[in-house]
């Protein structure tokens, strides 16, 4: 049985301003080189496009549910894009439940997803943690952020860096 590894691929790595093809090519090579012994679930974040859409909805007073839903849509769009970048077309689409992930993982070595079902205050990183716990798999967080913060440092100037956790 292949070991499952769950990766959170930050949207800022996929599309910092433009698509980062150089990074994505190296990422693809690394993942595909390791499918002999591992299966991967790659959870894609929404990145700056999600933040821009959410900001636009905030500006017109849209509620948090609608803001979350546009963020979820961005994560799923990024997941679809990255799957195509890997030259993979997940024939049943982007999974949106743990049960669907289970089914996909039985058939594929690499599964791409974004956020799953709507939950208040959910992020792609918390989704990745939930998926990793479900599969009893390691969680690797790939991001442009320099470390762990109390809040998103891009959105909150009072975010504090956490240098150590136990």
Language-model segment annotations:
Residues 58, 91-104, 109-110, 119-121, ...:
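Active-site phosphate/oxyanion-binding loops
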């Amino acid at each position: 049985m292949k070991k499952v590894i769950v990766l959170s691929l930050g949207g800022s790595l996929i599309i910092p301003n433009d698509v980062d093809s150089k990074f994505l090519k190296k990422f693809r090579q690394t993942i595909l080189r390791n499918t002999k012994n591992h299966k991967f679930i790659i959870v894609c974040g929404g990145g700056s496009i999600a933040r821009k859409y959410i900001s636009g909805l905030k500006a017109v007073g849209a509620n948090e549910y609608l803001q979350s839903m546009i963020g979820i849509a961005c994560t799923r769009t990024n997941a679809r894009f990255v799957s195509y970048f890997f030259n993979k077309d997940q024939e049943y689409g982007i999974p949106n439940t743990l049960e669907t992930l289970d089914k996909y993982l039985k058939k594929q070595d690499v599964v791409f997803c974004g956020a799953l079902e709507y939950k208040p205050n959910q992020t792609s990183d918390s989704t990745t943690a939930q998926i990793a716990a479900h599969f009893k798999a390691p969680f690797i967080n790939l991001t442009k952020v320099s470390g762990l913060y109390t809040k998103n440092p891009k959105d909150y100037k009072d975010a504090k860096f956490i240098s150590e956790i136990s």
